[in-house]
Amino acid sequence: MIPFPNKKYQIIYADPPWLERGGGKIKRGADRHYNLMKDKDIINLPVSQICADNAHLYLWVTNNKLIVGLEVMKSWGFSYKTIITWNKDRFGLGQYFRGITEHCLFGVRGSLPYKIVDGKRQQGLTGFYAKRTKHSKKPEEMRRMIEKVSYQDGFNMIDLFARQKTEGWGVWGDQI
């Protein structure tokens, strides 16, 4: 495993490489693009070691990984608060249903205060529409929402399982 940074973060943004079980033997999904991880390996990642005492977690899950995502959140030391749904412009793969949504679980560790700007609490929405682009790339609308709702001066942010560097964010993953 790649070592985690020796730093504490108030904002954790994670898009784990979930091991999905498809209906056939042909590689058609995420396994064509990057190495996948078993649920237990994601659950057991020592993410709590890099979390500040008061932190926010934004954890991407596919529809069939919702329950496991809640287990991951708990094992990483966060309490579930809400779910944010990305409504996509076109459907993807699926078994019984073809997916047109993806979800980001929001959790809190400790008591990170609400972000206040000009006397008003900054709030996001629990759903948004954005076009799909390349495989597994998450929409920038989500990152902007995170920065609106959670980021405050002096906070450290990290993108776990990152596939690209983003200004102002720490990154961790085997695709950087």
Positions of predicted regions on the chain:
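Class I S-adenosyl-L-methionine-dependent methyltransferase catalytic core
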Residues: 1-176
